[in-house]
């Protein structure tokens, strides 16, 4: 369930699952950087709450491929304990998704708002799916405590025991037309996903983009990035390619998650 209408890119259909939203303080988002927040609010009022907070949404993406296969990019928070950040939440956001029909889950990174929903009540949320994770994230968070460190690493260990987890360290195409691209910086093993149909493509960024301002200023970072400089390098490269080739873009934390990028930044 979502407030966002599905989009089509070629024969690819993309729907969002919106779990809810929270209002986060702008002062915490861009440390050490000078941002014209008043100008940003004028350009994109939908992205802000009042004068000092932005509207942080959590979207997962349901992608139906031309072959008819259903895949997911990220899974949202799910019932990850004890995280409940919502200003407003959606009751049973997955009610319109046949979870047994999902064949692959592309986890962009192991933060709980992206991977927490892979496991529900200790059991696989998507029982017939292979769940894809980059090895660098799996290793980096091996010593974490899930709730304290806000990652779903240990919760997902049950998927490994069941043989449902694919942990790899290369860019790859696990399904025809679905490309996993290593875009480190936010986390060591952060991935973005590019889904193609002929000459058309959609880039599902993960947290490569966290704020709309970063589309025009890819060198700006979020306070949530573990390696800000590496994240900026990943962002510059991928957004340059997206602009050159006219890719559609889907961003999980934007209130309006679908758009594209041009010379002036984020385009709806």
Features from the language model and the residues they span:
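Conserved beta-strand hairpin/beta-sheet module of binuclear metal-dependent hydrolase folds
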Residues: 3-95, 192-211
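Active-site metal-binding loops of divalent metal-dependent hydrolases
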Residues: 19-20, 75-78, 110, 136-137, ...
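Residue-level marker for buried hydrophobic side chains located in beta-strands
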Residues: 71-73, 106, 131, 202-204, ...
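Active-site glycine- and acidic-residue-rich loops that bind
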Residues: 111-114, 179-191
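Cap/insert and terminal regions of metallo-dependent hydrolase folds
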Residues: 200-268
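Metal-dependent catalytic neighborhoods of phosphoester/phosphodiester hydrolases
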Residues: 83-85, 116-125, 261-262
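Metallo-beta-lactamase
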Residues: 88-113, 125-182, 230-246
């Amino acid at each position: 369930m979502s407030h966002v209408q599905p989009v089509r890119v070629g024969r690819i259909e993309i729907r969002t699952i919106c779990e809810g939203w929270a209002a986060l303080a702008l002062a915490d988002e861009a440390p050490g950087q000078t941002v014209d927040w008043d100008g940003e609010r004028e350009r994109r009022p939908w992205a802000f709450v009042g004068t000092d907070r932005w509207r942080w949404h959590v979207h997962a993406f349901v992608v139906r491929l031309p072959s008819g296969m259903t895949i997911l990019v990220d899974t949202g928070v799910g019932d990850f304990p004890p995280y409940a950040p919502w200003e407003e939440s959606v009751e049973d956001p997955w009610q319109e998704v046949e979870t047994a029909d999902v064949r692959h889950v592309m986890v962009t990174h192991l933060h709980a708002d992206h991977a927490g929903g892979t496991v529900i009540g200790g059991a696989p949320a998507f029982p017939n799916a292979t769940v894809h994770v980059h090895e660098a994230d799996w290793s980096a968070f091996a010593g974490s405590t899930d709730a304290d460190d806000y990652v779903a690493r240990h919760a997902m260990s049950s998927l490994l025991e069941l043989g449902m987890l694919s942990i790899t360290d290369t860019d790859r195409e696990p399904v025809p037309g679905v490309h996993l691209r290593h875009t480190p910086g936010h986390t060591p093993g952060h991935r973005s996903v590019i889904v193609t149909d002929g000459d058309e493509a959609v880039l599902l960024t993960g947290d490569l983009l966290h704020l709309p301002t970063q589309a025009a200023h890819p060198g700006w970072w979020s306070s949530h990035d573990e390696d800000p400089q590496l994240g900026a390098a990943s962002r510059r490269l991928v957004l340059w390619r997206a602009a050159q080739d006219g890719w559609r873009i889907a961003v999980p934390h934007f209130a309006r998650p679908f758009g594209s990028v041009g010379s002036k930044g984020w385009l709806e």
